[in-house]
Amino acid sequence: MSRNAMRVLALANQKGGVGKTTTAINLGTALAAVGERVLIIDLDPQGNASTGLGIEQREYSTFDVLTGDASIIDAKVATHVPRLSIVPATIDLMSFEREVGDSSGKHYRLRDCFAELAAHESDDARTTYVLIDCPPSLNLLTLNALAAADAVL
């Protein structure tokens, strides 16, 4: 992989309790420990990746990013793990499908956010891995993750 390439991995399964969040946190921490810059996107309205990394309620969340009310740059929060950041989730994600309705491009909102992220980062601080912690369902949030991902775990 080119040092400047950003790899996007979605952690998805329709069943809850199978280890998506645990894998996202542990894989993100391991990648950061070997020098990679990692961003976790918490797409699960339960927000367990966010709370698991010690992030409580923040000004902006993935809901705000996906609805266009905040940029991914503004919503990104540093964690206690060096080189590991997260865009935290809130329960507001439950209303995402209703919020976007039948708007065009609704399946590609997350993918478009990553283009914005790459455009605003300098080479020495470029995110090398994005891990998307998906909700336990095949809904519009998960479809956004799958459309944005290079690979799925």
Regions found by a protein language model. Name each.
Residues 1-153:
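P-loop NTP-binding core
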